[in-house]
């Protein structure tokens, strides 16, 4: 009986940790997304926001967990140059470029 209670307690503890981590990840991603969107919009002011957002999504989808944390931290600290640098690194990768190409076609064909 004690073993069953121990397993149930462990399961509940791990479930709570996973849920907390999911919330933290979502908050970091949202902060990073806002930072990337702001950086791209400021670097390309003539591009409508609707066209910048798909690029931002591609950057966030292809950034590593460490890059998401760095982008989020840089955003909070107001380090726009760091956000631009990290965004450029992620944009230079082939999977991100493929994502951006698809997003561009979608944005142009489905305004």
Each PLM stretch: what is its role?
Residues 2-10:
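Sec-dependent signal peptide recognition
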Residues 13-16:
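C-terminal motif of bacterial Sec signal peptides marking the signal peptidase cleavage site
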Residues 18-21:
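Bacterial signal peptide processing site
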Residues 9, 31-32:
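Hydrophobic, lipid-facing residues on alpha-helical transmembrane segments of integral membrane proteins
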């Amino acid at each position: 009986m004690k073993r069953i209670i121990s397993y149930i307690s462990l399961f509940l503890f791990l479930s709570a940790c996973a849920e907390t981590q999911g919330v933290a990840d979502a908050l970091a991603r949202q902060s990073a997304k806002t930072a990337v969107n702001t950086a791209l919009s400021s670097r390309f002011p003539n591009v409508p926001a609707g066209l910048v957002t798909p690029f931002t999504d591609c950057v966030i989808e292809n950034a590593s967990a460490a890059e998401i944390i760095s982008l989020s931290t840089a955003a909070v600290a107001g380090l726009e140059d760091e956000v631009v640098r990290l965004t450029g690194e992620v944009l230079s990768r082939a999977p991100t470029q493929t994502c951006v190409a698809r997003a561009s076609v979608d944005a142009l064909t489905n305004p």
